[in-house]
From Swiss-Prot:
It comes from Mus musculus (Mouse). Detected in brain, kidney and liver (at protein level). Inhibits lactate dehydrogenase (LDH)-mediated conversion of lactate to pyruvate in mitochondria by competing with mitochondrial LDH for binding to NAD(+). Also inhibits cellular lactate utilization. One of its GO terms (cellular component) is mitochondrion. Disruption phenotype: Enhanced global lactate metabolism with elevated glucose consumption, increased ATP production and decreased perigonadal fat pad weight and fat/body weight ratio. Elevated serum and secreted lactate levels. Conditional knockout in astrocytes results in initiation of gliomagenesis and development of neurological symptoms that include seizure, ataxia and/or paralysis at 55-65 weeks of age. GO terms for molecular function: L-lactate dehydrogenase inhibitor activity. This is PTEN upstream open reading frame MP31. Keywords: Mitochondrion. It comes from the Eukaryota. Interacts with lactate dehydrogenases LDHA and LDHB; interaction with mitochondrial LDH leads to inhibition of lactate dehydrogenase activity, preventing conversion of lactate to pyruvate. It is found in: Mitochondrion.
């Protein structure tokens, strides 16, 4: 999925700690869009 690759790319760019926060933010946004 494009979200997974985006999180991975962001993780490499920002570092693991920021990536975890970004990943959770993207999951929430994705959940809202799917509803």
């Amino acid at each position: 999925m494009w979200r997974d690759s985006l999180c991975t790319a962001a993780g490499y760019a920002l570092g693991r700690r920021d990536a975890a926060a970004l990943s959770s933010l993207l999951s929430e946004a994705a959940a809202m869009m799917e509803v």
